[in-house]
C-alpha cells in the first residue's frame, strides 16, 4: 500500500512540475525568443504608445474611419472579456432586426452609396472581436472616408489595397484588411 501511495505521489508531483511549470515556461520562453511581437500581444503603436492589438477589433464610429465588423459583445463593443457570438439563428427576429438596423446605419452614413453592402459589415462574427473585414467591406466605405478626410477616393482605395492580405496558403479564407492598421495609416495622411 505504501509503495502504491508513494509511486502515485511521485508521479503526481512529477507531472505537475512537468506540465504545470516546465512546459509553460518552455513555451513562453520559445514564444518570446521566436515570436516576440506576437507573444507581446501583436500590439500596434502610435508615438511609442500602444493603442491596440492587431488581433482584436476596435470600435470606430466616426465617418473618417473604416468601420469593422459589428461586435456581438454586449454591452460594450469589442470587449475581449465578453467574447462570444450572439447565438441567434438566421431566422431569429432579433438577428433580423439587428441586421436591418445595421443596414440602415450604413445607408444613413453614406446615402449616395449604391454598392451592395458586404455581409461582414452587418453580421457579427462568432467571437465578436474580428480585427479584419473583407476587401469588399473596406472598399464599400472608401467614398465616405475619402469625403470625411478630404482625400480622393482613389487615395483611400490605394491605402486599402496596400493593407490587403491575401488568402492563407493561397486558398483559405478571403482577402481581408486589418481595420486598426488601416485607420492608423489613414490618420497619418493629411489631405
From Swiss-Prot:
Task: Using the UniProt record, give the first listed, main subcellular location.
Answer: membrane
A GO CC term attached to the entry: plasma membrane
**In the UniProt record, does the keyword NADP occur?**
no
The topology of this chain with respect to the membrane is:
Single-pass membrane protein
Which sequence ranges are marked TM in the entry? Answer: 7-27
For this UniProt record, the keywords arranged alphabetically read as follows:
ATP-binding, Cell inner membrane, Cell membrane, Ion transport, Membrane, Nucleotide-binding, Potassium, Potassium transport, Transmembrane, Transmembrane helix, Transport
A single Gene Ontology MF term assigned here is: P-type potassium transmembrane transporter activity
Q: Does the keyword Ion transport apply?
A: yes
Q: Where in the cell is it found?
A: Cell inner membrane
Q: Which family does it belong to?
A: Belongs to the KdpC family.
Under PANTHER family, the record lists:
POTASSIUM-TRANSPORTING ATPASE C CHAIN, POTASSIUM-TRANSPORTING ATPASE KDPC SUBUNIT
Q: Which NCBIfam families match?
A: kdpC, PRK00315.1
Assembly with partners or alone: The system is composed of three essential subunits: KdpA, KdpB and KdpC.
Role, per record: Part of the high-affinity ATP-driven potassium transport (or Kdp) system, which catalyzes the hydrolysis of ATP coupled with the electrogenic transport of potassium into the cytoplasm. This subunit acts as a catalytic chaperone that increases the ATP-binding affinity of the ATP-hydrolyzing subunit KdpB by the formation of a transient KdpB/KdpC/ATP ternary complex.
- Listed name of the protein: Potassium-transporting ATPase KdpC subunit
Record organism? Methylibium petroleiphilum (strain ATCC BAA-1232 / LMG 22953 / PM1)
Encoding gene, per UniProt annotation: kdpC
Amino acid at each position: 500500500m505504501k509503495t502504491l501511495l508513494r509511486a502515485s505521489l511521485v508521479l503526481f508531483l512529477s507531472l505537475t512540475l512537468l506540465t504545470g511549470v516546465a512546459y509553460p515556461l518552455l513555451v513562453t520562453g520559445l514564444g518570446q525568443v521566436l515570436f516576440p511581437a506576437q507573444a507581446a500581444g501583436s500590439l500596434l503603436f502610435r508615438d511609442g504608445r500602444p493603442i491596440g492589438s492587431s488581433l482584436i477589433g476596435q470600435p470606430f464610429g466616426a465617418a473618417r474611419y473604416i468601420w469593422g465588423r459589428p461586435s456581438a459583445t454586449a454591452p460594450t463593443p469589442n470587449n475581449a472579456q465578453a467574447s462570444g457570438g450572439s447565438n441567434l439563428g438566421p431566422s431569429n427576429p432579433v438577428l433580423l432586426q439587428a441586421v436591418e438596423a445595421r443596414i440602415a446605419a450604413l445607408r444613413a452614413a453614406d446615402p449616395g452609396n449604391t454598392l451592395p453592402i458586404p455581409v461582414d459589415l452587418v453580421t457579427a462574427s462568432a467571437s465578436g472581436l474580428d480585427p479584419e473585414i473583407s476587401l469588399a467591406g473596406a472598399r464599400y466605405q472608401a467614398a465616405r472616408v475619402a469625403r470625411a478626410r478630404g482625400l480622393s477616393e482613389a487615395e483611400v482605395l490605394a491605402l486599402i489595397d496596400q493593407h490587403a492580405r491575401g488568402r492563407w496558403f493561397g486558398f483559405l479564407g478571403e482577402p481581408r484588411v486589418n481595420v486598426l492598421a488601416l485607420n492608423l495609416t489613414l490618420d497619418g495622411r493629411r489631405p
